[in-house]
Amino acid sequence: MNAPHMNDTAADAATLDDAAAPAGRPALTRREQKEAYENNKLFKRIVRQVGQAIGDYNMIEQGDKVMVCLSGGKDSYAMLDVLLRLRERAPIDFDIVAVNLDQKQPGFPEHVLPEYLKQVGVPFHIENQDTYSIVKRLVPEGKTTCSLCSRLRRGILYRVAGELGATKIALGHHRDDIVQTLLLNMFYGGKLKGMPPKLQSDDGKNIVIRPLAYVKETDLEKYAELREFPIIPCNLCGSQPNLKRAEMKALIRDWDKRFPGRVDNMFNALAKVVPSHLMDTTLYPFQSLRATGEADPQGDIAFDEEPCASGDDAAAPGAAQPISIVQFDDL
């Protein structure tokens, strides 16, 4: 799906249903008008960002059948909602099927998702698999079960995608999830690894996409409240929270408040990698590197804190002094 087309589609779709007072009702107050305006801005921003991500990474193509994985959380609800809006005006044809994995967690409200999906008119499939009992049997009480649960869920969803004939699997990870994963891998895994917007699945049979890759979590929280999605709690399994990921989430929230733009810069850095200025010998041929005699615009000069002084400035206090280069012929 080409980015320009998707952006046009996003612009066309970006009108919130209830942004104005319905006919026959009293005119909106100034406060209500302001809220409606802000809500419409939020919707337009999310739709634009989803459309841009889809276009940038060619996530959805003509004839695709997109399996939208719906957990009952705010992120997957928002992803489905926006994809449905975009599909209405997309320049290509693609199908959407919503899939939920009922893992038989105690207290899981089985009726919520089917009722919602019937209401919005989306084809859906509920996969019933008691992974909860497996996880409880294998993971000691009080430990985090998320990792094992995730692996089991992933394998089941890959199988279901094949059975349904889905060509793309859409997950609801957002910008904050991606940055959190980057930090977790750096701090605890010793590697530069994030969460890509598009990838081939572990089994090599599926393409996984993340249409919300450019969207902030705070925007999704506001959007879920605005759209009144029937949210299903994510702690029904009784698992202890992933403390390391919770730590990264709190760190990102704090940075967003105290240092606006910092998290965005970190996120943008994932798409602007300079292998010659890292240390991975598999990405850059350091061992065979030789001087070419030609200036490199991405060389070390890009990291100078300030330009070297010249002319009259050279003698100023604190100014950089010229360096004498001595030839050592006997070395």
From Swiss-Prot:
Residues 1-33 are annotated as: Disordered. Its EC number is 2.8.1.-. It comes from the Bacteria. Pfam families: ATP_bind_3. It is an enzyme of class 2 (transferase). GO terms for cellular component: cytoplasm. Residues 8-23 have a biased composition (Low complexity). It is found in: Cytoplasm. Keywords: 4Fe-4S, ATP-binding, Cytoplasm, Iron, Iron-sulfur, Magnesium, Metal-binding, Nucleotide-binding, RNA-binding, Transferase, tRNA processing, tRNA-binding. Binds 1 [4Fe-4S] cluster per subunit. The cluster is chelated by three Cys residues, the fourth Fe has a free coordination site that may bind a sulfur atom transferred from the persulfide of IscS. GO terms for molecular function: 4 iron, 4 sulfur cluster binding; ATP binding; magnesium ion binding; sulfurtransferase activity; tRNA binding. [4Fe-4S] cluster binds at residues 146, 149, 237. Gene3D superfamilies: HUPs. The keyword Transferase applies. Belongs to the TtcA family. Homodimer. Catalyzes the ATP-dependent 2-thiolation of cytidine in position 32 of tRNA, to form 2-thiocytidine (s(2)C32). The sulfur atoms are provided by the cysteine/cysteine desulfurase (IscS) system. The thiolation reaction likely consists of two steps: a first activation step by ATP to form an adenylated intermediate of the target base of tRNA, and a second nucleophilic substitution step of the sulfur (S) atom supplied by the hydrosulfide attached to the Fe-S cluster. This is tRNA-cytidine(32) 2-sulfurtransferase. It comes from Burkholderia orbicola (strain MC0-3).
